[in-house]
Every structure is written in structure tokens, then in C-alpha cells.
Curated annotation (Swiss-Prot):
It is an enzyme of class 2 (transferase). PANTHER family: GLYCOSYLTRANSFERASE. Belongs to the UDP-glycosyltransferase family. Its EC number is 2.4.1.-. The lineage of its organism: Eukaryota, Viridiplantae, Streptophyta, Embryophyta, Tracheophyta. The gene is UGT102. Probable component of the triterpene saponins (e.g. ginsenosides) biosynthetic pathway. No detectable activity toward protopanaxatriol (PPT). This is UDP-glucosyltransferase 102.
Length: 475
């Protein structure tokens, strides 16, 4: 009888890619295993559509893609932003239940487990109904998990965690060797209007799962991983990363060719790459400061600059129609020989290019792992979600990044945004980021971690062995 795992990623590209790549890894490591991935589309994230098409165009044996019915964006337009994604997930539960019901009744298939994204953990009720073991996948790192479990524990003990908001408090958090400043806590955990009680309910349920699979590796987060393992109230931990989509998603191939062609013409280790994720957008005054800082630094650059979502619109915009309207007068002409401003970027291909020597990033966890895999030092510019915590971990805990600023908040996720990072700060940190290995301890450490990341995924490496133990648990 065929063994089948069901994967349930959250409907956002950063969550989806990691789980699909992990499904491919599972299949490659176990010849008697098949995986079915349920994909639900988030109306704001066009990347899900593009990635989904690439999966259907290039099918993987024993990997089945099931597209859940698309939801009407109008159902969510009046909801507060923090409530949109949970609502999208909730509407899919009936469809998920019907499909799982059919799969568990099959005489040719044995469903050995359901692997759900952290945000999909409430699907546990359905798994329990059909006696299917449930496992949790965390697309974020072990440090973030440790903090979230810690805040959930404080909340359950009736401590008002919202008091940490805008405070100078430093927290002693299991999983962090250094005190964690309240200013880097993910805002959704300390905001009474941000759905924090819902988030804590997810981590409470997460404790009931069979195991937690994390996209990280022992050598990157040893302190945080060990802390999670020592907590008897947390299920077994399996670090199996870094899990990355190193082939890209096939979208915008013509644009990618132009960008990579430009990089081919640049000297080795000469370019700083600026890219801030799907929701990483700036107001015009901040764009101008970044431009001035880049120009003053004297370094070659590739800058992925995307516009904010216009009011009344629901989909992400890939590029500006006229860059001259938002950049300083004459900037494009003055920097035409050393820089290129783009919209969408083939991030993995760019980071893997020999011309790229530095990465100014929003510090999403996938981007952080990609920078480590390719050995490219990061200048941290966190904007929303857990990114401030990731930046703190990379800079203070691990010594793998240059800090630009941790107070900036993206206007999409915050109603007030009057903080500006000045050109002088940007210029200084770019120069520090781009120092060569002789003068940069950070660059040396990142190079060492690059090698460790590859060893972790190789035979008998830490993540390789962790996955083998997970198979013993599942099968």
C-alpha cells in the first residue's frame, strides 16, 4: 500500500515555496512515499499563481498538487488586515476535510500524516477526526519559535504582553543568549488590535502536534534549537533546512535574462543587491534617501524597487511605470554605468551570482537562509512581521549581518510611518557591508556558515540525519 503525506501550506508565497521544496526533498529521500500538496490562493499574492503554474508545467513524480477553490476578495475587503489571512484559511477547511475524507477511504493509499503550516494548525480537528497524525511546519526560524512560545506562556499566565509595545524593556527569552529588546518583538504579538490572542491560540495548539519541522539547521541556530528541545511542553523538534527553491519559479524569464546579463558585465564581488520582499515598499521620501545613500557609497548596485499597493487595489505591483517620478532628479543618468533599478528580481539567481557581494534585505527568513547558502553578507532592513527579530538574531546573536536600522515599520502593516533612515546611515552601512574578507569579520563568518549549510544537507549532515529520524517517526 502506498504511503501518502498531505502538506498544507499557508496561502502566501514565502510559506508555499518552502513546503513544496520540502515535499520534493521528502520524495527524493523515501522511495515509497508520495506527497499531496493543497494550495490555496491568497488574492493579494500574485506569486502563488506564478509558482503554481511552474509546478504544473514541470511536474515531480509522486508529488500531487491540489488547488483549493479560490475565494472572492470582496469577502475580506472590510476586515482588518491581521484578520484577512486567518479568514482565508478558515474558508478552506470544509474543502480540505472533504478531500482528506476521500483519501483516507482509499484502499490503495495509507495517509501517514498531515503536515500543516503553523498558520494552518487549526486543521488539527480534521486530522483528529480521521485519526491522521498532525505535524507542524515552521517557515520561520527556531529563534522566532522560541520567542512565540515564550510570549504565549506569559499570556496564558495572565501577563499583559501588550505592555511590551513601545517600551524599553529587555526580555530574557529561551532560545536567545542575549536579552531581546521589546522593540524587535513582532508587532502582532503585542498589539491588542492585531489579533494577538488568535496567534497565541495557534501556538497553544502547536504544542499538541506530533512534532515540529523547522526550516533551519543546527549549526545556524544551535542555542535556539537546544532550548526548544529542552522544553518538555514542546513537541520533538526536527531542523531539516536550509530548504530553498534554487531553481526559481520560471516567471519573468526574459526580465531575469536581462538582469543576469547586466550582472555578467560587472566585476566579481562588486555589487550590492537591494531587495525587500513582496511587501517591502517605501514612501517617496525614503526612496530618495536610499538613492542618495547608494550614490554616495560609490558601490555598484542592483535595486529591486516596488511601488506600494494603491488604495482600492488588492494586488501587489511589480514595478513603477516611471522611475524618474520617485527617484532624485538625474539619479538614473548619474548612476547608469554602475547601477540598475528594477522591479521584480530573480533573487536566488542574483544572490548566487559571482558579481554580488552584499545584500540589503528585509530579513524574511527565506531570504536570510538564501543569503547564508550563497555566503552573501546582509545589511538588515526589517520591515514587518518577525523580520525585526530575525535581524536582531543575525546581527547580535550570530554576528552574520550589518545592522542598518530596526525601528523602521512598513506603511502597509502600520498606520503611522514617519521614521526615515537617512542617506548618511545608508552610505556608511553599505561601505561596511561591502568590505572585503581581510577587513570584515562578518564576511568571514558568513563564508564559514555557507559551508556549514551545505554540509548540513549532505549525507550524514545534521539536517540530513534529522530528516531520517523524522521518517522513522512518520513511517
Amino acid at each position: 500500500m502506498k504511503s501518502e503525506l498531505i502538506f498544507l501550506p499557508a496561502p502566501a508565497i514565502g510559506h508555499l515555496v518552502g513546503m513544496v521544496e520540502m515535499a520534493k526533498l521528502f520524495i527524493s529521500r523515501h522511495e515509497n512515499l508520495s506527497v499531496t500538496v493543497f494550495i490555496s490562493k491568497f488574492y493579494m499574492d500574485t506569486g502563488v499563481d506564478n509558482y503554481n503554474k511552474s509546478l504544473l508545467t514541470n511536474p515531480t513524480p509522486r508529488l500531487t498538487i491540489v488547488n483549493l477553490p479560490e475565494t472572492d476578495p470582496q469577502n475580506y475587503m472590510l476586515k482588518p488586515r491581521h484578520a484577512i489571512l486567518p479568514s482565508v484559511i478558515e474558508t478552506q477547511k470544509t474543502h480540505v476535510r472533504d478531500i482528506i475524507s476521500g483519501m483516507t477511504q482509499s484502499e490503495s493509499t495509507r495517509v501517514v500524516g498531515l503536515l500543516a503550516d503553523l498558520l494552518f494548525i487549526n486543521i488539527m480537528d480534521i486530522a483528529n477526526e480521521f485519526n491522521v497524525p498532525i505535524y507542524v511546519y515552521s517557515p520561520a526560524g527556531a529563534g522566532y519559535l522560541g520567542l512565540a512560545f515564550h510570549l504565549q506562556t506569559l499570556y496564558d499566565k495572565k501577563q499583559d504582553v501588550t505592555e511590551f509595545r513601545n517600551s524599553d524593556t529587555e526580555l530574557l527569552v529561551p532560545g536567545f543568549a542575549n536579552p531581546v529588546p521589546a522593540e524587535v518583538l513582532p508587532s502582532m504579538y503585542v498589539d491588542k488590535e492585531g489579533g494577538y490572542d488568535y496567534l497565541f491560540s495557534l501556538f497553544r495548539r502547536c504544542r499538541e502536534s506530533k512534532a515540529i519541522i523547522i526550516n533551519t539547521f543546527e549549526e545556524l541556530e544551535p542555542y535556539a534549537i537546544n532550548s526548544l528541545r529542552m522544553d518538555s511542553m514542546i513537541p520533538p523538534i526536527y531542523p531539516v533546512g536550509p530548504i530553498l527553491n534554487l531553481n526559481g519559479d520560471g516567471q519573468n524569464s526574459d526580465e531575469a535574462a536581462v538582469i543576469l546579463g547586466w550582472l555578467d558585465d560587472q566585476p566579481p564581488s562588486s555589487v550590492v543587491f537591494l531587495c525587500f520582499g513582496s511587501y517591502g515598499t517605501f514612501q517617496e521620501n525614503q526612496v530618495k534617501e536610499i538613492a542618495m545613500g547608494l550614490e554616495r557609497s560609490g558601490h555598484r548596485f542592483l535595486w529591486a524597487l516596488r511601488p506600494s499597493i494603491p488604495k482600492g487595489e488588492t494586488k501587489l505591483q511589480l514595478k513603477y511605470s516611471n522611475l524618474e517620478e520617485i527617484l532624485p532628479v538625474g539619479f538614473l543618468d548619474r548612476t547608469s554605468c554602475v547601477g540598475k533599478v528594477i522591479g521584480w528580481a530573480p533573487q536566488v539567481a542574483v544572490l548566487g551570482h559571482e558579481a554580488v557581494a552584499g545584500f540589503m534585505s528585509h530579513c524574511g527568513w527565506n531570504s536570510t537562509l538564501e543569503s547564508v547558502w550563497f555566503g552573501v553578507p546582509v545589511a538588515t532592513w526589517p520591515m514587518y512581521g518577525e523580520q525585526h527579530l530575525n535581524a536582531f538574531e543575525m546581527v547580535k546573536e550570530l554576528g552574520l549581518a550589518v545592522e542598518i536600522e530596526v525601528d523602521y515599520k512598513n506603511e502597509y502593516f502600520n498606520t503611522k510611518n514617519d521614521f526615515i533612515v537617512r542617506a548618511e546611515e545608508i552610505e556608511t552601512k553599505i561601505k561596511k557591508l561591502m568590505m572585503d574578507e581581510k577587513n570584515s569579520e562578518i564576511r568571514k563568518k558568513v563564508k564559514e556558515m555557507k559551508e556549514k549549510s551545505r554540509v548540513a544537507m549532505s549525507e550524514n549532515g545534521s539536517s540530513y540525519n534529522s530528516l531520517a529520524k523524522l521518517f522513522e517517526e512518520i513511517m
